[in-house]
């Protein structure tokens, strides 16, 4: 989950204009803060449980390794949500210091990039397993998956560095402290000379985040699962329909949960403080909160007979969802 620009300042030709959160009604701020607190509590408990099961109760396979790190990215995001919620309740006042402001922003960005990259990696893994089974039998090992995991974390960390650098605390004339992006990295926040530079860097960050954090992963996921679905339909590779339903759940939840966020970030490039900006912020908080809490649970329950869910243990649900599909592995192209 990443709301790193929700408290930014927007630069126009003459002054520094506070973004949408200044114009949020108290009820809206309460909704956002409450959603963040609930997401943090429930997400920490459920994702912590899922991590424990995947790490200590299941055989270590490519599937369990990739899903472990996907859920770990959700877990990291939920741990820092209380800071955002507290800031919302205090009218965006930040009282945790500059260092934590930077860590907060960088961690949120890291959580966003790792989650979408691991979803893409899982899609690519299913593509290779289904359409290239011979290669998968020879090379698809937990050690190979560990290399993928390391590459994802390094890539996400590298892409998060700008959001660590640009994030600073700003003291206004009334003594209020805000944690926000200073794209020009200038101590003179209201310098007219730096406004153009700030705007261009802001646009560059938005474009790179949208392309690498949404558009490219979304196309990768769509391509991989479309090919997998075609092969499954053609040769009936899976013993049940659950793996396919998990794929569809991943695609839908990815789009629904992240599209509002990127729409809101695009609107932040304008100085038009409209109702649409306020609504997209609320929707972004709700959908990304849903993503960190319920996406792993959806993977477990999708395709299950609801009456049988409560008769299964958590471990049985995990094994039916994340275990390797031997029928695919035995199939030769």
UniProtKB/Swiss-Prot annotation:
Q: Where in the cell is it found?
A: Cell membrane
The UniProt function text for this chain reads: Orphan receptor; could be a chemoattractant receptor.
- What keywords is this UniProt entry annotated with? Cell membrane, Disulfide bond, G-protein coupled receptor, Glycoprotein, Membrane, Receptor, Transducer, Transmembrane, Transmembrane helix
The portions of this protein that span the membrane are 31-53, 65-86, 104-124, 144-165, 210-230, 247-268, 284-303
Entry protein name: Probable G-protein coupled receptor 33
* Xref: Gene3D superfamilies: Rhodopsin 7-helix transmembrane proteins
What cystine linkages occur within this chain?
101-179
Topology with respect to the bilayer: Multi-pass membrane protein
Which molecular function terms from Gene Ontology are attached?
A: complement receptor activity; G protein-coupled receptor activity
Q: Which organism is it from?
A: Homo sapiens
The entry's note on the tissues where this protein occurs is: Expressed in spleen, lung, heart, liver, kidney, pancreas, thymus, gonads and leukocytes.
